[in-house]
Amino acid sequence: MKFRALGLVLLLAVETCKAEEITCEETKPFTCNQTDRFNRKHFDDDFIFEGGKGRGLNVWDGFTHRYPEKGGPDLGNGDSTCGSYEHWQKDIDVMTELGVDGYRFSLAWSRIAPRESNQAGVKYYNDLIDGLLAKNITPFVTLFHWDLPQVLQDEYEGFLNHEIIDDFKDYANLCFKIFGDRVKKWITINQLYTVPTRGYAMGTDAPEPYIVAHNQLLAHAKVVHLYRKKYKPKQRGQIGVVMITRWFVPYDSTQANIDATERNKEFFLGWFMEPLTKGKYPDIMRKLVGRRLPKFNKKEAKLVKGSYDFLGINYYQTQYVYAIPANPPNRLTVLNDSLSAFSYENKDGPIGPWFNADSYYHPRGILNVLEHFKTKYGNPLVYITENGELLILSGCNVKGYFAWCLGDNYELWPSRSFHVSPFYLLHRKDKGAFPSFEA
């Protein structure tokens, strides 16, 4: 079976911006002084690979300045990273040299809005999009990669509040209107699972979890409905959403751990895929979570069901799963409501070679994920939107592949400052940039 190929690069706009002269206060809610503001010959021809000025503050600015210890051992933040805002033309030159023909990046909500359009931000993205298209590089544009404008967090607690749905729709409407004549691949939200769990359950990310996830799904669906009704007939683009995925295998062959593994698939993958394909949450989640899990009314269920033209799949790891008691020492949360826990090792050793921190390589897992989506969710059109190595499972509807990432960035996770790029741009600081030997 032949597949097609496109690019190599992904770089988050939110992570390449420099916040200007931020001053922050120890208040609740948090406030700041600027709140207002590979080888392609085996692939078909149309397969896709991807290998600030005027910006207001977002929740990551506030979070990392108020709690610098959560920025990793180097107390890092995103004030200055690999500088794509200033060096986007050089980035495009590098992509061209590498033969990339797809680039996935995110729009920084706080650079464009939230209350009125920011012309400096709009010009930057217009220039970037035009520059990509001039080099025959297809832009894949994400509307939200966790960088909520701080003003919306301060006003009504962001995704905890239903009001976010219409604000997100208004922001998306502005983006479709300004950029949609040239952008034909839109992603609403990156990794639906991440903000509810890491932001509202673990506390490692800038801010519940079930309410936040529910509002994310509704915000996503409303934006998709807007695009399909108002813009798609003329602009002829596609719109989807990105799922962070993992694969799960039983810790051992006991029935309890096999059952725990299946439950966990529903809590991790089904939590979002069941609403997107059936308009409801998985039955096992309804049973175990109970009243803490919101419900879609009939109108909402119809809106959410089928609200994607394609899915982005991010994959990095596979974990062993084992059962835990129904009444564990620590109270149940979104992270263990499935009555399961995770490990990278079982009695036979690690699940794969060590990568970094507590992560291990397990490339086979992405094949398992793709097969799962093929058999359980109707074989949707898929772009692998973050991954480090290309692996395709025959029969799965995979259209493109994006390696993470173009430049080493400020990683939104503890131990933030490590190299993640198979080809990386060295931290510039006016020194220019050049590819590493990995390219």
Curated annotation (Swiss-Prot):
A GO CC annotation given for this chain: secretory vesicle
Domain of life: Eukaryota
Record flagged with keyword Acetylation: no
UniProt-annotated glycosylation sites, renumbered to this chain: N33, N336
EC number from the UniProt entry: 3.2.1.147
Keywords of this entry: Glycoprotein, Glycosidase, Hydrolase, Signal
Binding, a beta-D-glucoside: H145, N190, Q191, Y316, E386, W404
A single GO BP: carbohydrate metabolic process
Signal peptide: 1-19
Record InterPro entries: Glyco_hydro_1, Glycoside_hydrolase_SF
Reactions catalysed according to its record: a thioglucoside + H2O = a sugar + a thiol
Gene Ontology MF annotations: thioglucosidase activity
Catalytic residues, chain numbering: E386
Tissue localization of expression: Expressed specifically in stamens and petals.
Family to which the UniProt record says this protein belongs: Belongs to the glycosyl hydrolase 1 family.
Name of the protein: Putative myrosinase 3
Organism this protein belongs to: Arabidopsis thaliana (Mouse-ear cress)
Encoding gene, per UniProt annotation: TGG3
